[in-house]
Every structure is written in C-alpha cells, then in structure tokens.
Amino acid sequence: MDSFNPTTKTQAALTAALQAASAAGNPEIRPAHLLMALLTQADGIAAPLLEAVGVEPATIRAEAERMLARLPQASGASSQPQLSRESLAAITTAQHLATELDDEYVSTEHLMVGLATGDSDVAKLLTGHGASPQALREAFVKVRGSARVTSPDPEATYQALEKYSTDLTARAREGKLDPVIGRDNEIRRVVQVLSRRTKNNPVLIGEPGVGKTAIVEGLAQRIVAGDVPESLRDKTVIALDLGSMVAGAKYRGEFEERLKAVLDDIKNSAGQIITFIDELHTIVGAGATGEGAMDAGNMIKPMLARGELRLVGATTLDEYRKYIEKDAALERRFQQVFVGEPSVEDTVGILRGLKDRYEVHHGVRITDSALVAAATLSDRYITARFLPDKAIDLVDEAASRLKMEIDSRPVEIDEVERLVRRLEIEEMALAKEEDEASKERLEKLRSELADQKEKLAELTTRWQNEKNAIDVVRELKEQLETLRGESDRAERDGDLAKAAELRYGRIPEVEKKLEAALPQAEARENVMLKEEVGPDDIAEVVSAWTGIPAGRMLEGETAKLLRMEDELGKRVVGQKRAVQAVSDAVRRARAGVADPNRPTGSFMFLGPTGVGKTELAKALADFLFDDKRAMVRIDMSEYGEKHSVARLVGAPPGYIGYDQGGQLTEAVRRRPYTVILFDEIEKAHPDVFDVLLQVLDEGRLTDGQGRTVDFRNTILILTSNLGSGGSEEQVMAAVRSAFKPEFINRLDDVIIFHGLEPGELVQIVDIQLAQLQKRLAQRRLTLEVSLPAKQWLAHRGFDPVYGARPLRRLVQQAIGDQLAKQLLAGQVHDGDTVPVNVSPDGDSLILG
C-alpha cells in the first residue's frame, strides 16, 4: 500500500467510511461502509456507474444500509476502527486496476470494481444485481470515456456534458420548448453556416428580447422533426452552461480541466454535437485568473478554426462590439447572423403560436384581440424594450393577474362574510341582555343573520362551481397538450400503432370533452369570475408599467375630457385660447387621432408676467394626474451657458457625472407620461434649442449614454416674456428675432396671453381665497368674504404691469396677516366662521 495514491473523492470516501464506522461503534471498516460512502457522495461517480450497468443505485443503497444495521458493535472501544480484511483487499484490487489502466491516481470507479471483486457480502450483493467487476470495467467508457486519471479530481470531468450543459434536442422531443413561429430566414442562415467545412460557427447578434435563443430552440425542434439538410440530421444541440462550469472551481486549473473535458467529449462525438452558448461574450475572460491567463475564449479558438467544434453563439450588439470584436482572432472564427426586431404583424403571429401554452399554464382564455393589443400597445408605449419579448411579457402578466383573481375570494363573498362576522358578535352581546327591547332586537338580528348566512352559502357555492368549471377546462387542455406531445414522439420513434391510438382515439375523445366543457364554462350568467384576457387587461398592465393611460376611456373620463376647458378655466382666468389649445391636444391623444410619432402637444406661451402661463401648466398636470407636482419644471435661466446643455441630456463619456444621466432625459425615462414646463425659455443658451428640435419633431432624444428617450407621451410647454406689453405683431416679431425659424416651425402653437382685464380680477380673487380656505380647513375655519370685500381686493390688487401676482400678496397681507394675529391672541378659535368686510373708511378689510 506504499504507492496508494487516492483521488480527492476516494480519500473523502475513506474518511466518510471511517467516521460512519466510528459513529456506529463498529470495530472495523467493512466494505458496506465504503459502498455507502461512495453512494452518498455529492457529484459522485458510483451511482452513474451502477446506472450504466443497469442497476438501480437506490436498491443497492437500501441493501447496504441493512448490512450496516446487522454489523456487530463494540461499546467502550476508544481506538479508531481499522480496515477489515475484505476492505483492504478491495483497496488493493483498486490499486492494481489503476496501475493496469495506466492511471496515476486511484479513483472511486477503481474502488467500486475492488468492492465488487472477491467473496465479501458487498461483492456478492453487487454481482448478484448484475454489477460484476467485468461489467463495471466495461461501463468505464460510458462514464469517463477513454481519458486516463491524471489529476486528483478527475470525477469533475466525468460525464462533463451532462453536468455542464442542457440537451435542447431532448427537451424538444419531450415538448418542453415553446413553438418558434417565423424566423425562417435566420434559421436557414444558421443551418447554412453550420453546414460549412470550417468556421462553421454562426453567432446570432441582436437586441435583447428579439428572439435569439428562440432561433436555436427552433433549430433543435427542426432537427427532431427531421426538417434539416442531411448534414444536420440526427445531430444533438446542447446549451453550454459556463456559470455552472466556473461555480465551485476552487483551484487554478480546475475550470480549464472541466472545459477541456467538455471539449474532448464534443470532439469525440465526431461532429454529432452542435454547441450553443447563450451570452457568448462571457467566454472572453471566463476562468481567467490574472494577466495573460488562459480563458475559455482562448481555449476554444483552435477547435473553432479547425471546424472540430460547431458553436452557435448569441449575444447583443453592444456586448459583441465590447468583447468579441476586440479579439480579432476570435471574431474571424464566427459568422455573424443579424436578428432584427420583428414587426407588429409578425409579433401577433408569434403570440398566436404561444397562446395555447400560456392558456394551459394560467388556466385562462386569451382572446385574439388581447394578442393584437399586446403587440400594438407594447410597440407604442414600451419603447426601451424590444418585440416580441415585451409583448409576450404583457400577455403573461395580464394572464397571471387574472389567474390570481380567480384563485382569490371574490369581493362579494368577502363583504357578506364580514357582515356575518359582525352580526354574530352583535348576537353574542345581545344574548346577555334581559330587557324586552334587546330580546326583540335579538330576534330581528337572528333573522337577518340567517338570511346573510344563506346568501354567503349561495355565493360560495356559485364561486366554487365557477372555479371548478374553469379548472375542468384547464385540466382538459393540459391533458390534450400532453397527448399531442406523446403522439408526436410516438410518430418520430416509428411507433405508429401508439401514434394512431392517440391521434384517432384518445385525442378526439379529450377534444370532445373540452368542446362540451367550454360552452358550460362560457354560458354562465352573472359570473363572479372573469376568465378571459381581453385588450383592457393588456392596457391595464401597460398603464401599471408606464403610467400612461393606454386603456379604453371609461364614461367618467370621457365626460371629464369633454369639459376640460371648464376645469382648467377654474384655475386660469381670461386665457380661453390657451386653455382651448391645450385641451384639444389632450383629447386628440386620448382619442387616438394624434400623430403617434410626435409629442402629445408642444406650445409656446407668450405674454407679460403674472397672467397664468405657468399656472396653466400646473393646472394641466393637476387635471391629468390629480397631482400638480407631476410636472417636470425646468427653469431655463439655469441653462444660460453653453456647457449647461449637458445637464439636460447628461454628460458625454469621459466627463464627471457621465453615469448620472440628464435632468430632462432621466425625468422622462422614469415618468414617460408627463407635462414638461420650460420656464422663461428666452433666458437659455441658443444651443439648448438645438437639443429641443429633435424632441419637438420626432418625439425622442438621445441622452449622454446613447439611450433613446421617448417624449411621445409628453406635453411640452415653453413660456417666455418676450415682447410683453406690445401688440401681437410686435410680440411675434420679437419671437422671430430670438428663435430660429426651424424651432418655431416645430411647435404646435404659439399662444399669446393677454393682460388681465379689471373684470377678470374678481374671479382670480375667488381662486386666491379658495386656496387660503384650503389651508385653513385643517383648523375647521371658514371665511365669509362679502362681495364689497372681493371688489376691494380686485381693485387694490390690479396692476397691469405685474398681472395677478400682486393680488396674491394683497390677500396674504389684508386677510392672512390679520387672521394670524387673531388666532394667536385667542380672538378666533378652531371651527369659527370669520366674516370679512370693508372698513368704514374703505382703506382696509375688517375680520370679525
């Protein structure tokens, strides 16, 4: 035993056997201890070796446990258990076998053969079940191939393909892959490249979510169906998992050893295996431990060039440029196959192909109009992602929402249940009372409780019946899908009798049951459970993701939009044309008649200070979002220098703040449906207007990091004081001299706000008083302002130069200041009504 050189796993098995014998109080380490240690090893080779000779490892393990239970125990023995004669013989046999096979280490498979040799109880057990020494030796090739054991951890390289990859063709045979619709040109191009003699390595390049991985799954399905040229017939497509290959590689060289084992297996398959690596850029640098170290990319280069490894890669445009193109030697070994984003029409076709899978998974019905809505709405509103992925996600989430509602108790049942609980508590309280009134009330309450319990039972039964009907349909659909998969498998395997029995017997039978169950599920009246995904459900998900109201307008919202001028007019006085223009823009967008490739509206508001330009933008945000803060306000006076343009869209690469994004672009990316106010636009540097040209015309803007930000659901309002006080012609002349023609030409409308008339001031007084009243509501104070007092405020607060702002200050001074003093002095208390009148001399207002 001087030359005994065990692998890490063999040493671990011997240690585990020693510990097990010691814990059980056995004086000797018997072959049964060694066998149990080998069978219970994580990632051990004993179980696969037994399976390779047709023996069930669980059976052997159960027998070994019974043997261990019968072993003698020595109590009080302090010394460690020693190897028994049979165990020593097994280890010696393993050592001789390793020498015979020219292996440098005694591996666990050598030890398994040693345990099966001789006349020990374990040897009889293994041989009796068919795991004879000769059978186990013949199985070596299946498990470890023709490789010699030259490292202390060879087990990590055994069955490397099974450990570190997924067989896509096997998954396709089992029907576990989603159907691939379209993409014929891309699959044909992949097949052409794979059929080459050398450099037969296509790399699928495209944006995330366009279906690169699906193309490889489509190839696997075609190979299984036999719909490929002779050169690819009966080939196996495996998806390599580099993550699991790197995971747990503790020592330098361990990752390379695993990868080499996988590559050797692929090489030995003589071209039968096509390898797929998703996220191909991960091979660059994978497993490298320092400068100049070998990584996965460098290890596979020679095989790629010689055509020994047929590799299909998939990666995005950015990552291909960043990682693969940098390594020219690696890039030249790949043939690029560009995968573009499918059109909306193609996406609808893809969704129709996937519809059955999602219906079976969620147990709901998905209407065709929902699929069309998913494709169109995702294309229109979810701009940062790509079809068909974003459309599939919409359908999936809408269906999962509906499934969650079906599984939850309906609101009607919840309400009745709470009422029953409340009545039961009342009943218990009244039962303790002795007076006649309480007894009479108790009788009425019991009658009501009985009615409500009956109603609850009826509702629960109805809900349960509806749920059962939906479950029956789902189970039948699952059954049908399983049978169709079995039928396809039987046909491929040439079992025509089974295929005929399924296709003409069991499948029509289940289809008939489904046809009978569907009308029953659909014909219910006053349904409690909705089981159909429609366009409105898709629109709800879009709204939840983006905040954009994409759904059909409800009656309440329609009425609200039709009277939009009245609502905005309550806040902005005397500017009918501006209110009309903004209202028309919002209605066009919500009715779907606006140009989808431009912002909802873009306006320039001109006029003197204090006439309501900024107030209209706030009122619009308040109207649309019920929150006046839901507005991006950019004070253009802060953008007077040339370099400040970078603050709007984000600093370019190489500058400080590059990773932070721009103030305008980031605000719109986070909230794509918003009002953007560019206040005092004339104070900005002229270069800022060049940035806005693209927004006004195309509805998009590229930020400092190269991302396109969508402005198509925003309303842009630019305010300016240019030419204020002049005539309309003078104002427009000032605008034309300050802004370039291409900038003015891209605006929807240039609206001139007129100075306020004295008659309009009373309405503004009402607005200012209403705002003050809202602040006083917390103290339950009510102001009663007389008409003369309002007229006094309007007269004193009017200033044609400064607009309505002096009026706000006057309300604060004449009413707010007096009221504050009276509250502090205790003259006015919470809940009081405070009258406001003009003083006898007409110089001030009197409170109280």
From Swiss-Prot:
One Gene Ontology term, aspect cellular component: cytoplasm
Region (Repeat 1) residue spans: 6-71
Domain Clp R per the UniProt entry, residue ranges: 1-146
Name of the protein this chain belongs to: Chaperone protein ClpB
Keywords assigned: ATP-binding, Chaperone, Coiled coil, Cytoplasm, Nucleotide-binding, Repeat, Stress response
Compartmental location: Cytoplasm
Name of a matching Pfam family: ClpB_D2-small
Coiled coil ranges: 392-526
Similarity-based family: Belongs to the ClpA/ClpB family.
Organism classification: Bacteria, Bacillati, Actinomycetota, Actinomycetes, Mycobacteriales
Any GO MF annotation of the entry: ATP binding
Span list, region NBD1: 159-341
Region ranges (C-terminal): 756-848
Function summary: Part of a stress-induced multi-chaperone system, it is involved in the recovery of the cell from heat-induced damage, in cooperation with DnaK, DnaJ and GrpE. Acts before DnaK, in the processing of protein aggregates. Protein binding stimulates the ATPase activity; ATP hydrolysis unfolds the denatured protein aggregates, which probably helps expose new hydrophobic binding sites on the surface of ClpB-bound aggregates, contributing to the solubilization and refolding of denatured protein aggregates by DnaK.
Gene that specifies this protein: clpB
Organism: Mycolicibacterium paratuberculosis (strain ATCC BAA-968 / K-10) (Mycobacterium paratuberculosis)
